[in-house]
Curated annotation (Swiss-Prot):
Organism superkingdom: Bacteria
Catalytic activity: a fatty acyl-[ACP] + phosphate = an acyl phosphate + holo-[ACP]
Keyword vocabulary terms for this entry: Cytoplasm, Lipid biosynthesis, Lipid metabolism, Phospholipid biosynthesis, Phospholipid metabolism, Transferase
Protein name stated in the entry: Phosphate acyltransferase
EC number(s) given by UniProt: 2.3.1.274
Species the sequence originates in: Lawsonia intracellularis (strain PHE/MN1-00)
Amino acid sequence: MLNSHSITIAIDAMGGDYGPSVVVPGAVKAAQITGAKIILVGNTPEIEDQLALLQVKNTKIEIVHASDVANMDEKPSDILRRKKNSSIQIACRLVKEGLANGIVSAGHSGASVACGMFIIGRITGVERPALASILPTEKNPLILLDVGATVDCKPYHLFQFGLMGHTFACDLLNIQSPRVGILSIGEEEGKGNTQVKEAYELLKMAKDINFTGNVEGRDLFTGNVDVTICDGFVGNVALKLSEGLSSSLSRVLRKELFSSGIFSKIGTFLAKNAFKNFSKLIDYAEYGGAPLLGLKGIFIVSHGSSNEKAICNATKMAVLFEQKETNKRLIDSIGLNEELTRFGHSC
């Protein structure tokens, strides 16, 4: 494993709902924990103000000025063409030029995907990138991909998502032989639309992955698979549905418990550790972000409402990616299955 002190991560300091006031403290904490060098990209005076408030000393923090910001109401294509001096574009160029190993951004997710693809570039052989989200289950965490990078997929795109998800699970979740499934409308082979059925056949023939077949939506959170693949449209709907459901259930549970009688309140007090553990389980900040797999550099896309903890954990994930040399293993896996990808093209 590579020494984290030799790793550099560029962070979009202007990204997210809160900008430098949250991103800078999270980045500083990550630098202190990992020992990695951090490049904060954004408005220099604003970043310096935050560093002064934190009284940062003896930490490997550098600032690269960006005079522009990618706004959430702008089209990704417009940001890519017109905002060359935006923090997201400059951070991506640092990775492309070899000045940083990876990037973390809580900014415009569409711009993140566009800039990642067209500035950093895709790994040779990778057709489309995929955003991989980590979700809680009854057992172990689940990797769901794609959750929004590629909404219109060919079967061979899904096939490559399976390869990339397998490698991610091996390296980041330390699973020796992750179980890979494809999201469909039934467990049995032959269920699903044409896209899913053709991808299923490719995945059955894949080298070095443990493909277990179809996964129904109701089984996503049972923990019976480690990686579930789907196109970015379905994946994003599934992700937002799970986030909304968990938030609603938490609010309903809290309301019922605290509006009931004295015995319910006593029970709530006795079970406070269980509720604390549950809250931690469904907190997206625990992992910090979703890696955009398939690029030549590391790119962690964080939630727009990320707090300091989320930024810190996203940065730690980027460092771990480089330490584990995950991209090299992705390249090996894509190369090993190159013939199947070509076969998928011909179908």
